[in-house]
Amino acid sequence: MKPLIKICGINDFNVLQQLVSMDNINYLGFIFYEKSVRNVSPEFLEQVKEFEFKGKRPVCVYVNSDQDFIKETSSYFKDPILQFHGNETSDFCNSFDNEFWKVLRINNQINVDEVIRYEKASGILFENYKKDQPGGTGESFDWSLINSVKDLDIKIILSGGINCENVDNAIAVSYTHLTLPTTR
C-alpha cells in the first residue's frame, strides 16, 4: 500500500502550483498561525480562492484559533480538513462541520486516553514535543511509541523529522499517512 503524503507549510503560490502537478502528493497544508514563518498571508488567500486543487485535499492548520477565524479562513478552500495543533478540546474540534485531524505532541509516551478523547477525529497526527513550540520542529520522536495505539480504530498520521534516511521506517510505523514540510 502506498502512503498518503501531505506537504505542509505552503505559503507561496508558485510552490502550490508545482505541488498540485505532482502525482504522489495527496494533501496540501496551509498554516494559519502568526508565529509561524510559514503562516499564510491574506494575499495568498486571495490567490487560492478560485484555485483548482486537482484532487488534492487542502488541510488548514490552526493553533488555538477562535471559531470565527477558522470559519473565515477555511472558507477560501473547498472541503478542507481542519488540523488542530493547539490545546483545542474535543468539543471545540467537533463543533465544525469539517473533517478534522488532531495533533498530539509526543514527549516520552503516548497518552492513550487523550487519543480516545478525540475519537471523532478522522486522523490523529503524532509529532515531536518541543517546549513552547506547537509544531514544525523538524525533529522526530521515538516512533516505536506508535505501537501503543496501533490497535485503536484511528488513522495514524506521522509528522516531524521525516527525511530521506528514515522515510522507509516512517512508512513502516504509520502505514498510510506522512506529513512533510515545505522548505523554509
Each PLM stretch: what is its role?
Residues 8, 183-184:
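Intrinsically disordered, low-complexity Ser/Thr/Pro-rich tracts
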Residues 176-182:
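Conserved small/polar residues in nucleotide/adenosyl-binding loops
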